[in-house]
Swiss-Prot record:
Residues 1-20 form the signal peptide. GO terms for cellular component: extracellular region. Residues 21-44 form a propeptide. Keywords: Amidation, Amphibian defense peptide, Antibiotic, Antimicrobial, Cleavage on pair of basic residues, Cytolysis, Hemolysis, Secreted, Signal, Vasoactive, Vasoconstrictor. It holds the Pfam family FSAP_sig_propep. Its main location: secreted. The modification Lysine amide is found at residue 67. This is Kasstasin.
């Protein structure tokens, strides 16, 4: 009876450890995804800030190209 109890406790401990490890991995993936979204948003803001001063020139160039 003692061996069965020990095996059951060992099995439950391994399952618990596995579930906790999976949870940590999932949280890590979510954190990396959030960081990736933040980096992407920051890059878009930086791109727009650099593009704005040149926007009127780009529009004029396109308009001149259309006029021929």
């Amino acid at each position: 009876m003692m061996k069965k109890s020990m095996l059951l406790l060992f099995f439950l401990g391994m399952v618990s450890f596995s579930l906790a490890d999976d949870k940590r991995e999932d949280e890590g993936e979510e954190k990396r995804a959030d960081e990736g979204e933040e980096k992407r948003a920051a890059e878009e803001k930086r791109f727009i800030k650099e593009l704005l001063p040149h926007l009127s020139g780009i529009i004029d160039s396109v308009a001149n190209a259309i006029k021929g």
